[in-house]
Amino acid sequence: MAIEFTKYHGLGNDFILIDNRASKTPAITPEKAVEMCDRHFGIGADGVIFALPGENGTDYTMRIFNSDGSEPEMCGNGIRCLAAFLADLEGLSRNKDTYRIHTLAGVITPQLTPDGQIKVDMGLPRLLAGEIPTTLGAADGKVINQPLEVEGQTWEVTCVSMGNPHCITFVEDVAAIPLEIIGPKFEHHPAFPQRTNTEFIQVVSRDYLKMRVWERGAGITLACGTGACASLVAAVLTGRSDRLATVELPGGPLEIEWSEVDQRIYMTGPADRVFTGKL
């Protein structure tokens, strides 16, 4: 059976989008997703995203298979791409259209704005060790500036969940981090029973952060939306940042706000269609 798809990217974090609205079961297996994501022998992507029927009163359901076949709870850049994909499927003009999307991390609400950006209500950050989850500290306590030994070096880390686990550490120069070496060590560290995404953050000013990321199940990527959100939260918790800041990723900038009004995280950034095809 031929599979129609459209490729999108959010700041270079790229995804294969599949219209799965006719069924609650993904059209392909995780093993097939691995083949499709291969950048040499497949289409090439960081993951495959399915637009499925909504659940519990939502408009749609989002599921993702990473490039290694694993299934994350949510993806920030991915949900912006999904919102753009749905708008294109429905023939909408991207003018203040809002979707309620069911994900494994809860209900996420992206809004398509007149300037072509997509603003996403990412919900409340989860800060307790048991929610992340991590074995660092007590399960009912926060993990802020905790020591973590990785590869013989002690790192100060702050842990945040945006529905998926993030371990954030602040460094002098993100460009100097050997991400391909140290990233997998963080991801598979025994302190993270469900593995973890890891963000290395350089604070340029209180409203400007530079970030590099090792994504759980995908490795080095050009951008990570949930990671940018978690990193701002970590920067605020450690007194390094204001609650509204630009997070500069290798693929470009995201605007992240941790609202003082409702304590929710709002992410604003682009999502662009690359091409369509059939496999």
Swiss-Prot record:
Any idea where this protein resides? Cytoplasm
Q: Does the keyword Cytoplasm apply?
A: yes
Q: An example Gene Ontology cellular component term from the record?
A: cytosol
What EC class is this?
Answer: isomerase
- The answer to whether the entry has keyword Kinase is no
Q: Which reaction(s) are listed as its catalytic activity?
A: (2S,6S)-2,6-diaminopimelate = meso-2,6-diaminopimelate
One GO BP annotation here?
lysine biosynthetic process via diaminopimelate
Keywords linked to the UniProt accession? Amino-acid biosynthesis, Cytoplasm, Isomerase, Lysine biosynthesis
Molecular function terms in GO for this entry? diaminopimelate epimerase activity
The record's EC number reads: 5.1.1.7
InterPro entries for the chain: DAP_epimerase_AS, DAP_epimerase_DapF
Copy the pathway line from the protein's UniProt record: Amino-acid biosynthesis; L-lysine biosynthesis via DAP pathway; DL-2,6-diaminopimelate from LL-2,6-diaminopimelate: step 1/1
**One Pfam assignment:** DAP_epimerase
Q: Cite the active-site annotation.
A: C75 (proton donor), C224 (proton acceptor)
Database matches in SUPFAM superfamilies: Diaminopimelate epimerase-like
* Residues that bind substrate: N13, N66, G76, N77, N164, N197, E215, R216, G225, T226
Q: Where is this site: Could be important to modulate the pK values of the two catalytic cysteine residues?
A: H166, E215
The family this protein is said to belong to: Belongs to the diaminopimelate epimerase family.
Subunit-structure text: Homodimer.
Q: What does this protein do?
A: Catalyzes the stereoinversion of LL-2,6-diaminopimelate (L,L-DAP) to meso-diaminopimelate (meso-DAP), a precursor of L-lysine and an essential component of the bacterial peptidoglycan.
Q: What is this protein called?
A: Diaminopimelate epimerase 1
Organism (species): Nostoc sp. (strain PCC 7120 / SAG 25.82 / UTEX 2576)
> Gene name?
dapF1
